[in-house]
Amino acid sequence: MSRLREEILGEESGEDCHVIDLMGFSDEILLHILSYVPSTDLILNVKRACRKLATLCLDKSLTHAVVLHKDYQVSKDKVKQLLKEIGKEILQLNMAGCYWLPSSTIDHVLRCKNLVKLNLSGCHLTSLRLSKMLSVLQNLRSLAIDVNPGFDASQLSSECKATLSRVLELKQTLYTPSYGVVPCCTSLEKLLLYFEILDRSREGFILSGQLMVGESNVPHYQNLRVFYARLAPGYVNQEVVRLYLAVLSDRTPENLHVFLISAPGSFAETGATKNLLDSMARNVCLDALQLPKSWLNGFSLLQHVKFNNPFYFSFSRCTLSGSYLVQKVINGGKDLKSLTSLNLSGCIHCLAPDSFFRKAEDDIDSSILESLVVSCCNLRHLNLSAAHHHSSENLGKHLCQLLARLKHLLSLALPVCSITGGAANADKPPMQSVTNMLPQGFGKKARVGVQTYPRNVEQGHAKPQSSVFWTLLESLLLLESLELVGSNFSSAMPRNEPAIRNSLPACSRAQHVGDTEVAAISQLTYLRNLTLAQLPNILTGSGLIRIGAQCQHLRTLSLANLGMMGKVVYLPAFMDMLKYCKHLRDLRLEQPYFSANAQFFQALSHCSSLQRLCIISRNGTLQSDAVMSFMASCLEVIMCHMFTGESLTACKNLQQSIVRSFQAERPALNVVIFPLLHEDLTEVIRDVPMMHLDEITLFKSRVAEEPPNLWW
């Protein structure tokens, strides 16, 4: 490291080689380079290389904020040494998701006496350790923790409570019915609550939504500006969140400007919640709003609520009509230039004049979408998934053509059926451009019934003249996240329930979306996250190869139910795609009859940066020796989740072999291999670290799921 340098070779014309010594760069350039180095490597390795680096690595710009989140190689000893060397300099410490570190690691946070922000979500933390730590961190203003079974607020010392009384921001994930530390936080301005409480204990007992005996029931919300609650499925979560909301219904904070409740399924409105909503409509001016669908379906709140400069709306799964959306929410297009994130997922009538006498599959009213696009011209994140948004033949008024005006979009979620042509084209039988798929050569004929594809990327799909989807993506060159999900798609692996054995057929218009449309995605140079689900007309997967070759920033890939269900016809092309994915970190693959054999894992081994792998295949098979070889060759893999049709014995043996062989070298290794249709699946899932479960194992739409930068 003392002679960091880069050799720049001359061209074949015989130019001399030039040697650039990186130590000759300015401090500003070197600091920028070092900002990309993980904190542990920076302090424990790079700092020791030479005197200049030793000085630069201790620069405040590098030591004030330390991020250990997703630093999967960090160990207890490394954390101890890191905090020993620079603990006094750290103002922000993010250890979110460090589930593999023992609870004793938290003791070393005591060295960071000047901490202002601390994130311990997903870390093992007891009431006593929390008390001891917070008693020392008197400057703390932002805190994120988990509240697990056994948490006892009575064990918190007076010094700890004094620190909590000064905390302004709290993020709390609840795994047990409790207020946690909320009653102690008397100055709260931002409160984020994640309810992950199961309805049954491990022993099978039904849990109650009542809080533990002795807990204060008076949270202090008077200074609250941001309230966010996200509920996992389950009755207990709903009961507990009502207790948190009860205080809000008595007196709504005057400065409240963000109010978000994300609740799956049915979450009935009560008298208390109705009083809360009425109070909000009278007394506050909001900038962000999300409510359970049953609370919104009456629309009474939206008629009276006042908005200031709204930046986030989520009306996910509600029956909001397009006319109401234009008239009441976007105010005829006058006031929503500030809106940057909009979630209309599952709003099946949001682009139609009304919801009466209308089928979900009927064509949309393009004038409503046009009003939305004009009014919300600065949108960065838009979710229109889980609905049938079919366009008519009106020239220039197709959904894709209208969305192409949103030049600032960074993330977009669309139903597959929305990107096809108008109704006239939809009535034609689906066709793939076979000539585009075949390799060029003398006398090479296509075998009947066997699809082939071009192995040379340059021979891929040319832009069809009439493709509105190609035109859309040509206009969205900044797009980083794209989701194309079938309107009727449901994952075989839902939350807290047995696996789903059957799924609804794809929308008839989705039958016209195939390899050519998938190839259009390759235009997105900056694409980082891609989800494709329920595209039944994928014949060869040739479009995937172009994506792999041209989208070199791709980090997360999720594929589900592509092509025919009985056979993975796109597998050869997919394996060719993987050879290009050198920077891919997360891969989720859901396909009913997927054979994870040696060929597949050999191709996957080209993904040298891969960290997390999840395979879900109801009738799928595994080749154990191929899995072991893959794990040995891909040294970064720390999560391996496979839910297939293999026997319980075979799954357990493979899981034990992986853990036994690689756990010592990979402290964060999390392995779950289990039969998908086994009755104990939900019990196995509950032990998966929430970070992996939420980000990759469970399928969901993530575009505009919550406001951007909700937490630091």
What are the functions of these language-model segments?
Residues 36, 65:
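Core nucleic-acid recognition elements
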Residues 50, 87, 551:
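Short amphipathic alpha-helical/adjacent loop interface patches that line ligand
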Residues 109, 117, 121-125, 133-136, ...:
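Alpha-helical bundle protein-protein interaction modules that mediate dimerization/oligomerization
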Residues 27, 42-60:
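Short helix-loop-helix/strand-helix junction enriched in hydrophobic and basic residues
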Residues 55, 67-119, 123:
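F-box-proximal linker/hinge
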Residues 1-10, 15-16, 29, 77, ...:
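C-terminal capping region of solenoid repeat domains
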